[in-house]
């Protein structure tokens, strides 16, 4: 018996409309940040493989933090690094724990529907059907802030 390690093609599972929305946000002057529980190695691997790394101004891994989501530590750490206040940002999350972490950090959160998982997203400020819907919500809100965590 043999096994071969297969490389996952992350672009195949990239959220639809991400490649449309990221350039739109950057063109409007928004700064984008990833605040993920994944390792920095994995964050960089995925963003490079999908050709989206250059859109992000900051990438934060929660691996080195003592607490993980739903604890707000990763969001509080990112706010500290960027010298921002919670009211200056908005997060797009899909998981229950991610939404709870945003709430714990007093950050507004758009929940992107997670069809693959049975996440409770009721605590989010609003639920978007996909990333394009989240982008349209942001435009509707006409936010003056210019930082987003995803």
Which residues does each PLM region occupy?
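Asp-based, Mg2+/Mn2+-dependent phosphohydrolase catalytic module
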Residues: 23-26, 39-40, 44-150
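Metal-dependent phosphoesterase signature
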Residues: 1-20, 28
